[in-house]
């Protein structure tokens, strides 16, 4: 009997130790998971729709005060831009205090962030969307290759948008520029125009459409991102335009751009002329941009963002004549790529000026209430040739804007210009 009691004591003791070890392990796992979650969120941030905002109206003032202090302490460009942060605070603070609805707060904070005049400054407020972007030509907006969602709502290719919620397009774009984050006035105007199918607060929008001689009014529900399908394009596209001209579209600087480039580049690298297209490239990794640039330069040069990164021509670097197509959607890492290409002296730029912001070290910040924002933190600087890395779009050698006539007839104005230039028959624009 005594032996049995002793045995049970040993069993219970061992069981207790096992339970304790398991509890400690579980606690460690929970702590690790929590730490990892917080670490990941500190990098990526948390996005909120207007109806998900983790704030009550009585917290708006305190949260905005934190946002403003984060900006004052960390935003690296406001002095160069001539912004008086105290004056900016005095403009927004009473408006924030008067806000009683989440929609009011979201729009005011976004307006404040946009007032910082930086392309890489943003709030983490999600927009309702139709997963579509209009084609902007001068001050006119058109439907170009509509996605399934737009087609189901009655939109057709080449439709011209003339009004949003009854407001003429030019007026609507001007009124909404105050919410557009951009480093140049032209970029803010362009981003406002491109945002007609997105909204922080509206979930049903009316569009007046001109189709031939007909005028239509179409209603379009805007939905959460996870409720609409995005038509993704490849990172790199290559094609042979004719027996002497190759075409290479680089649509992102994010993975898998290098892998797709390695597959596509050899299919056009043997041709005497090559058109490289970054008009739809919104950026990604500047390191990838630097690697890609090495395929199009003919002598070593310093990377525009670094005093130590030397660009060396790749072993199989292109030996023919390179034309680089740029536009207002060329942004961030695509702009540092464009700047390196232009300053190489080996590449001819055609198209429209870029957005005007290579990045300036954007970082994410969070208030104690859980509201996230992103702002540039690196001091203003210039390339090794003296071009500002933020605040000025890169102007092509040949400024060639799109024309409505070419768009309506399915012609690419800028590619056609390059082809005529190669043939020696182009005229100045």
Indicate residue ranges for each PLM-predicted region.
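Long, folded non-catalytic interaction modules
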Residues: 108, 288, 295-296, 371-376
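C-terminal regions of proteins
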Residues: 307, 350, 354-400
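Cleft-lining beta-strand/loop regions that shape enzyme active-site pockets
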Residues: 201-366
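Flexible, low-complexity junctional segments that flank or bridge functional domains
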Residues: 2-273, 280-282, 424-429
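Low-complexity, Gly/Ser/Thr/Pro-rich intrinsically disordered linker/tail segments
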Residues: 396-429
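Short, surface-exposed linear segments at secondary-structure transitions and domain or protein termini
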Residues: 224-236, 384-387, 400, 404-409
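Hydrophobic, well-ordered secondary-structure elements that form the walls
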Residues: 341, 386, 418
């Amino acid at each position: 009997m005594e032996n049995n009691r002793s045995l049970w004591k040993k069993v219970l003791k061992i069981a207790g130790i096992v339970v304790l070890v398991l509890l400690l392990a579980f606690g460690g796992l929970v702590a690790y998971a929590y730490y990892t979650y917080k670490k990941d969120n500190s990098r990526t941030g948390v996005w909120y729709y207007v109806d998900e905002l983790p704030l009550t109206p009585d917290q708006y003032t305190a949260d905005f005060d934190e946002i403003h202090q984060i900006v004052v302490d960390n935003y690296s460009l406001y002095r160069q831009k001539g912004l008086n942060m105290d004056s900016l605070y005095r403009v927004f603070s009473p408006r924030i205090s008067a806000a009683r609805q989440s929609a009011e707060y979201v729009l005011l904070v976004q307006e404040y962030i946009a007032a910082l005049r930086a392309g890489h400054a943003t709030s983490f407020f999600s927009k309702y969307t139709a997963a579509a972007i209009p084609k902007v030509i001068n001050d006119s907006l058109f439907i170009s290759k509509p996605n399934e969602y737009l087609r189901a709502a009655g939109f057709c290719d080449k439709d011209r948008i003339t009004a949003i919620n009854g407001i003429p397009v030019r007026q609507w774009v001007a009124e909404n520029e105050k919410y557009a984050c951009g480093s140049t006035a032209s970029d803010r105007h362009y981003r406002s125009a491109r945002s007609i199918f997105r909204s922080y607060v509206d979930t049903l929008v009316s569009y007046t459409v001109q189709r031939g001689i007909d005028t239509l009014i179409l209603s379009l529900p805007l939905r959460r991102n996870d409720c609409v399908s995005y038509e993704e394009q490849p990172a790199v596209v290559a094609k042979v335009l004719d027996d002497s001209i190759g075409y290479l579209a680089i649509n992102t600087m994010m993975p898998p751009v290098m892998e797709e480039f390695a597959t596509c580049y050899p299919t056009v690298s043997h041709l005497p002329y090559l058109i490289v297209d970054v008009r739809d490239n919104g950026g990604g990794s500047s390191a990838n941009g630097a690697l890609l640039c090495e395929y199009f330069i003919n002598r070593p040069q310093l990377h525009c963002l670094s005093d130590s990164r030397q660009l060396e021509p790749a072993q199989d670097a292109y030996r023919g004549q390179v034309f680089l197509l740029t536009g207002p959607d060329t942004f961030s890492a695509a702009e540092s790529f464009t700047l390196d290409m232009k300053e190489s002296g080996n590449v001819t730029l055609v198209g429209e000026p870029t957005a005007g912001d290579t990045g300036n070290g954007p970082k994410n910040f969070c208030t104690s209430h859980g509201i996230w924002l992103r702002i540039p933190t690196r001091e203003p600087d210039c390339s090794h040739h003296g071009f500002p890395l933020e605040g000025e779009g890169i102007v092509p050698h040949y400024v060639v804007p799109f024309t409505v006539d070419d768009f309506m007839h399915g012609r690419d104005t800028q590619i056609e210009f390059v082809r005529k230039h190669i043939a020696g028959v182009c005229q100045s624009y």
